[in-house]
């Protein structure tokens, strides 16, 4: 996925949906922390979002997810799923603040 330089509300919602999916995949051990960092949860992405004036609440949740590896090293294993669920619930609350997107499709395939 290529992050556009001009991130609009649709892109913010797409980022949140990608974060939500990544957290669920982590919870179900379908991806690793390293993979989630390559996908979305990295300081590089956080900085890119900041530079493109993405809302603070989106940047904050992505930045917090960037710290998951450190968090997992200090909390007992039994609290990892609970931590992931808390983050997922926060993302869901943020998503509910957006109006429904009227566009027919979010993803457009360029068939050159």
Each predicted region: which residue ranges?
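Acidic, Ser/Pro/Thr-rich low-complexity regulatory regions
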Residues: 1-112
């Amino acid at each position: 996925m290529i992050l556009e330089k001009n991130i609009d509300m649709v892109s913010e919602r797409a980022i949140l949906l990608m974060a939500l999916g990544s957290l669920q995949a982590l919870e179900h051990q379908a991806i690793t922390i390293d993979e989630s960092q390559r996908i979305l949860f990295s300081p590089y992405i956080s900085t890119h979002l900041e530079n493109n004036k993405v809302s603070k609440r989106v940047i904050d949740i992505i930045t917090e997810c960037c710290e998951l590896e450190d968090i997992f090293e200090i909390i007992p294993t039994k609290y990892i799923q609970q931590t992931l669920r808390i983050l997922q619930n926060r993302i869901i609350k943020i998503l509910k603040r957006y109006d429904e997107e009227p566009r027919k499709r979010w993803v457009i395939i360029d068939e050159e």
